[in-house]
Amino acid sequence: MRSIDPNTLELEEKVVTINRVAKVVKGGRRFRFAALVVVGDKNGHVGFGMGKAQEVPEAIRKAVEDAKKNLIEVPIVNTTIPHQIVGRFGAGRVFLKPASEGTGVIAGGPVRAVLELAGIGDVLSKSLGSSNPINMVRATITGLTNLKRAEEVAKLRGKSVEELLG
């Protein structure tokens, strides 16, 4: 898989969660902030990143930098995905199903952020298992990574698209 240069894309960013985390030391607790950010160009490219710092803006900046290093390309057919798929990460599972035009993005919280920034306009989704935002985002990204267009599947099997689709 080739890497995607974030400088050539006009990326939008969306903060999914900001979490206050603590390190317990002899004198008490040391607080820091962990941010989960999704970036995308609404045209088939999306990525997520995590950052941690003592201040919220700095954590977000680090997360955006990390997200730009982890961009993936998503196959989009018209305004939806090529086929249904279940993305898995940890105990989080995300079921993604193509939808007809005009349906919109039917997804909750973290999954919606990923799908909208990827540029998918019509899709149905269901979050199963863990509702932890990090697991939800990673499961969604895993699902989108495993999507393939009909042409790619036909080429892998050595058949024509007509033979494949029947």
Swiss-Prot record:
UniProt keyword Ribonucleoprotein present: yes
Residue stretches making up the S5 DRBM domain: 11-74
Record bears the keyword Cell cycle: no
This protein's GO CC annotations: small ribosomal subunit
Record-level Gene Ontology MF annotations: rRNA binding; structural constituent of ribosome
Recorded superkingdom: Bacteria
Signal peptide: none
GO biological process terms held by the UniProt record: translation
Keyword line: Ribonucleoprotein, Ribosomal protein, RNA-binding, rRNA-binding
Family label: Belongs to the universal ribosomal protein uS5 family.
Domain notes for this protein: The N-terminal domain interacts with the head of the 30S subunit; the C-terminal domain interacts with the body and contacts protein S4. The interaction surface between S4 and S5 is involved in control of translational fidelity.
Free-text function comment from the UniProt entry: With S4 and S12 plays an important role in translational accuracy.
Subunit structure: Part of the 30S ribosomal subunit. Contacts proteins S4 and S8.
UniProt cross-references to PANTHER family, sorted A to Z: MITOCHONDRIAL RIBOSOMAL PROTEIN S5 (PTHR48277:SF1)
Protein name: Small ribosomal subunit protein uS5
Source species: Shouchella clausii (strain KSM-K16) (Alkalihalobacillus clausii)
